[in-house]
Amino acid sequence: MKLKSLLLRYYPPGIMLEYEKSGQLKTKSIDLLDLDPSTDVSALVEEIQKAEPLITASRSDQVKLLIQRLQNKLGQHSNHKFYLFKVLRAHILPLTNVALNKSGSCFITGSYDRTCKLWDTASGEELHTLEGHRNVVYAIAFNNPYGDKIATGSFDKTCKLWSVETGKCYHTFRGHTAEIVCLSFNPQSTLVATGSMDTTAKLWDIQSGEEVFTLTGHSAEIISLSFNTSGNRIITGSFDHTVTVWEADTGRKVYTLIGHCAEISSAVFNWDCSLILTGSMDKTCKLWDAVNGKCVATLTGHDDEILDSCFDYTGKLIATASADGTARIFSAATRECVTKLEGHEGEISKISFNPQGNRLLTGSSDKTARIWDAQTGQCLQVLEGHTDEIFSCAFNYKGDIIITGSKDNTCRIWR
């Protein structure tokens, strides 16, 4: 094995190694999730050298410099104030979803008008209209971090793969017998997973366009689906009240998480893949050990359904959004509620941390999105202007652009 280059990854903090093994270029990452501005860099470099044979003594100064750059970045706490940059009347019929590419340079919108549109964030101009579906385009995604492909899942029971550059369709994936309502690329961008009202999920090969596996076992629609960070596991959440974890390379069921007593609304791994977080219409979130599938905690306190939940990149904080109009932040270590986010006047359907992990973004049926301090729970900003419910909101990779999508058929860019 021969080390070719070292690359920085800012969020979450880490160093990517590009190395050659038997003539092939491979990558692996050293995750530095606990890095903070006070970390002893020399001691950390020694630790890394002991654990990683590719990092030889001759590379230690370079690694030290990279870690110092990461530390500087972590020290820059963003107090960015967002302003409305553009309003896009994206589609004639209602929007279903919005998604950003990694850099935030472009984003996509799905709609009841059976199309997906690709937009330039800086100018607000439409770059492509992706046409071909015969029903609502509901689930959409970029193959981040690459960002050169788009997947669209439709009520017409198919998923299509598109080129970002040309807007041309590469493949149409057929096989589901009911609407596709969720989809995800694996981190390597070799597979697309689709979840459907037909109770199954399917994995598709991006190169060949062929179906690789069908994941069967749920008894109701699959509404949430995601890969873990390394891409070797996939998680599906269903209206049958359960969540199942599958092996991505064999399609084998690893285990089913049973314990919620109502429909699942979200299911995600934390960054290091040690924990799984599930949110449910039963008003609770549960934390599960990702190794054995055992429930390690139930997070309570909300008075109504949990509509969304997520980890920050360190996996130390958990955020939950509820139909009771509040969001909460829990500590993953103590499982206690750290702070409550109060201020919305309607249900909160979306919640996410910014990439730095110090801000939270919420979208609500009260027609506003809000930005909160993740430590104190203080509301820092209210993004107003939509005339109907906000169902989708997202940060870009740097955390300095926000997109909101609303039932008023517009998208707003904030920067």
Curated annotation (Swiss-Prot):
SUPFAM superfamilies in alphabetical order: WD40 repeat-like
UniProt GO cellular component terms: ciliary basal body; cilium; cytoplasm; motile cilium; SCF ubiquitin ligase complex
Localisation: Cytoplasm, Cytoskeleton, Flagellum basal body; Cytoplasm, Cytoskeleton, Flagellum axoneme
Entry's Gene Ontology BP terms: intraciliary transport; outer dynein arm assembly; protein polyubiquitination
Keywords: Cell projection, Cilium, Cytoplasm, Cytoskeleton, Flagellum, Repeat, WD repeat
GO molecular function: ubiquitin-like ligase-substrate adaptor activity
Superkingdom field: Eukaryota
WD repeats: 90-129, 132-174, 175-214, 217-256, 259-298, 301-340, 343-384, 386-415
Family the entry assigns: Belongs to the WD repeat WDR69 family.
Its job: Required for axonemal dynein assembly and ciliary motility in ciliated organs, including Kupffer's vesicle, during embryogenesis. Facilitates the onset of robust cilia motility during development.
Subunit structure: Interacts with IFT46.
Protein name in the entry: Dynein assembly factor with WD repeat domains 1
Species of provenance: Bos taurus (Bovine)
